[in-house]
Amino acid sequence: MIRRILFVCSGNTCRSPMAEVLLRKKLARHASEWAKDTVVTSAGVSAISGSSASENATAAMKHKDLDLSEHQSRLLEAADIINADLVITMTRNHKKAVLALVPQALHKVYTLAELTALAELAHAKPEQAKKYRDMIQEVAQKTMELTLLLDQLLGNPPDIEDPFGGDLAEYEECARSISGHLDTLLQYLDQSQNQSQDQSQDPPQESSHSRDQSAED
């Protein structure tokens, strides 16, 4: 089960804090029980800890009735990655930086666009959703081939562009892009969590030895 989601960008002042508060809002409105228990955080691979969210990121979120005025940036640490169930980066370079810190986290680190592409595949062919997830897991074990194979599978999805230094319109566009990805991601997480719950509730399979023993009794 996914309980802890970590967003990662560069300075933790623009993209990842916007993604953090946007997803928190979407989870709060979501009806599923799992959403209520999910913890969302963010950090930056090159952040200066204690910095405020950028002025335009704060303004863009204010337009969505979200408050970033109290946000303080955090430098990404290995413990953040280890403790997270899912690590979502804004770009492939951020993903590489995460894996440089914790290589064994390969199976749970994706760019936001990669996850969206996977979610769309699962939505289009729900009967093959598990197949796609298993395929991603298998690919994740092959570090050297990961980027190439994911690009082939997901169509080389684009990164979330950094609006730092841009005007408010660029921040608004970045927020719209992140929000759209998160809507698709939320559908995928809901489907994935429901499948996990169904599997955990399946009765244990009776072994052939037990059936044979019962037949002899």
Which positions does each model-derived feature cover?
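Short polar/charged helix/loop
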Residues: 1-196, 202-217
